[in-house]
């Protein structure tokens, strides 16, 4: 994944954009998950995350359907994953297919993409946010808040 320059760099309010290599595991899984959600009639899917003190992760996954239609979070979807094996003194990485519930696949995707875009987000004071699949737009958006402790030193002599 690489950061792409925004189209209007003078506008500081415009969010950063990232380009995911479509052949990568994240790129493939994004396509698969969006297609699965669209086929089920979903409007959005959201994975919310929170963490601090060197730990954290996805807390909740929800899918918004039109007119409160049901959505089966336990339905299976085939996605890709990287598997590492230590052989002959070095790590060997392969890409494998795996079947997961849609809920777990969304959770795993969110965990992975947050680590890529906001590496170390859970350290120190941490952060929180949402990974939102917009099925109508065909996009995935991350809304992230970083937490930090601030101090303002002032010295006054009277």
Language-model segment annotations:
Residues 17-28, 68-71, 97, 101-108:
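Alpha-helix boundary/N-cap detector
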Residues 1-44:
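Long, hydrophobic N-terminal alpha-helical segment
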Residues 9, 44-46, 104, 109:
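Residue-level detector of intrinsically disordered, flexible termini
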Residues 122, 127-158:
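Acidic, proline/glycine-rich low-complexity IDRs
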Residues 74-124:
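Short, hydrophobic/π-rich interface segment
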Residues 28-88:
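Short, well-structured hydrophobic secondary-structure segments
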Residues 37-41, 101-105, 134-140:
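A short, structured loop/turn motif at beta-sheet edges
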